[in-house]
Amino acid sequence: MAESIKYIGASTHDLDLFEGQYSILNGMAYNSYVIDDEKIAIMDTVDKIVTDKWLENLEKALDGREPEYLVVQHLEPDHSGNINTLLKMYEHITLVCTAKAKAMLEQFDIEAENIMAVKEGDELSLGSHTLKFILAPMVHWPEVMMTYEESEKALFSADAFGKFGALDVDEDWSYEARRYYFNIVGKYGLPVSNVLKKAGKLDIKTIYPLHGPILSDEIPEVLRLYTIWSSYEPEDEGVFIAYASMHGNTAEAARKMKEILEEKSAKVAISDLSRSDIAKNVENAFRYSTLLCMAPSYDGTVFTPMADFIHRLKTKLYQNRRVALVENASWAPSAVKAMKSEFETMKNIDLIDNTVTIKTTLKENDIDALKSLADEILK
């Protein structure tokens, strides 16, 4: 970190779900920063769950001085949760935000006396540091902006380039950044691409995101991955087998298909949708070039875990992939029809014509059909 930029955020391991739905077994970091200059700026606040630690860090960073500005890059409660705390402590502080954010403050019960609404390219001098504001609408809320400080070559990136996980967890950035991106930001690929073009014109030495570690040496790889992810193109050539099984028969077929594909030197990932993290499954569906869905028929449609998974992909704008379908049925096959009808509504999905219907248990003729499908998948 630059000497003039002080970290005042905090991590927690006391939260089981982020946004009430995403498993965070390794905790979560809520980042906030102080830029120390003639005029002090605080870059965002934090979730209420880490208020005490944030206040402790803030007091230490300020060392008795009063901040002039609070830069509000994103109003989601995990970042705006302590704006009112700050306003009570420093009633004359000026909130710096976009016009859209200013219009939204009231719905978060935030009543600030001094508000500075900024536009694309506006600058704010703190003394030896100058903040330049970069609008980033729909990355991933409409009021979002980023902030660039030229003397330190620092980009404060709001939710972009963030990841799941507390800062005391040592893991490769991409491991949880990928799951974070496709589930939190992924739907908004075009806005992300637009802000990447803006970032590409900047000389960036350090990225300060609102979640996850501060980035420096990793920046070229981070930008490379974000360019791929935001284009909705696959990161890896390979097959993700997503299956759901009621009594174990479809699971057996899925394991057999994995074996067949790997014998043909394909890169394969596999997941039981009934027993795994749906956010991880969404990540893998976007990561690989081909998705193989295998599920039983159920109530005249497709088994519920598969229906939920496909619905989630649809909401995240899943596209530009090859998709293969396998169904299981004892008396009325309906899964392929149901799955196909959903994928046909998605953009640039290449549905493989060859589908497989298994009648309850896996038999030799079914294995032959799976081998034929594997050949189609790997064409």
Q: At which residue positions do the language-model features occur?
A:
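Short, charged N-terminal beta->alpha structural module
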Residues: 242-264
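Short N-terminal or domain-adjacent regulatory/targeting segments
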Residues: 208-235
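Conserved beta-strand hairpin/beta-sheet module of binuclear metal-dependent hydrolase folds
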Residues: 3-59, 146-149, 153-157, 250
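Active-site neighborhood of phospho(di)ester-bond hydrolases with catalytic His/Asp-centered motifs
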Residues: 43-45, 67-75, 95-98, 155-159, ...
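Metallo-beta-lactamase
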Residues: 1-3, 96-144, 188-194
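Active-site metal-binding motif and surrounding structural segment of the metallo-beta-lactamase
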Residues: 38, 49-96
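Short acidic active-site motifs
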Residues: 82, 276-281
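FMN-binding flavodoxin-like domain, especially the glycine-rich phosphate-binding loop
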Residues: 167-207, 211-214, 256-271, 281-379
